[in-house]
């Protein structure tokens, strides 16, 4: 079973949200909020309060005369209950 999460995102906004117990991940665009919520709760052993998402467009690519683009993806902001945290990402707060 593929979990759908590509990687954690570390931008200025996502680092600011870490202080509010909100974690940001890029995920495959075909996964729903409930699937990602269920996977995060199982894998990290945390309680998820809410999941916000938005779809990011793919980037244009050019190889010689051929124009193409990369696939679009979805960014999820996962809000955890107070008292829970994802330990691998907590080091980035300090």
Curated annotation (Swiss-Prot):
Functional summary from the UniProt entry: Binds to 23S rRNA.
Which PANTHER family does the record cross-reference, listed alphabetically? 60S RIBOSOMAL PROTEIN L23A
Keyword RNA-binding found: yes
- Subcellular location(s) per record: Plastid, Chloroplast
Gene (name only)? rpl23-A
Gene Ontology CC terms, in alphabetical order: chloroplast; ribonucleoprotein complex; ribosome
Family, similarity comment = Belongs to the universal ribosomal protein uL23 family.
Task: Give the matching InterPro entries.
Answer: Nucleotide-bd_a/b_plait_sf (IPR012677), Ribosomal_uL23-like (IPR013025), Ribosomal_uL23/eL15/eS24_sf (IPR012678)
User: Record's SUPFAM superfamilies?
Assistant: Ribosomal proteins S24e, L23 and L15e
* Entry GO MF terms: rRNA binding; structural constituent of ribosome
How does the record describe its quaternary structure?
A: Part of the 50S ribosomal subunit.
Which Pfam family is an annotated match for this chain, by its short name?
A: Ribosomal_L23
UniProt entry keywords in alphabetical sequence: Chloroplast, Plastid, Ribonucleoprotein, Ribosomal protein, RNA-binding, rRNA-binding
Q: What name does the UniProt record give this protein?
A: Large ribosomal subunit protein uL23cz
Please provide the Gene Ontology terms (biological process) for this protein: translation
Look up and give the organism this protein is from: Agrostis stolonifera (Creeping bentgrass)
Q: What is the lineage of its organism?
A: Eukaryota, Viridiplantae, Streptophyta, Embryophyta, Tracheophyta
């Amino acid at each position: 079973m593929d979990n759908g999460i590509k990687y954690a995102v570390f931008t200025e906004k996502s680092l600011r949200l870490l202080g509010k117990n909100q974690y940001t991940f890029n995920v495959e665009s075909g996964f729903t909020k409930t699937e990602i919520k269920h996977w995060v709760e199982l894998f990290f052993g945390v309680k998820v309060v809410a999941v916000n998402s938005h779809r990011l467009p793919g980037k244009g690519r050019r190889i010689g005369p051929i124009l193409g683009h990369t696939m679009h993806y979805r960014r999820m902001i996962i809000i955890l209950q107070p008292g829970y945290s994802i330990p691998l990402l907590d080091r980035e707060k300090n």
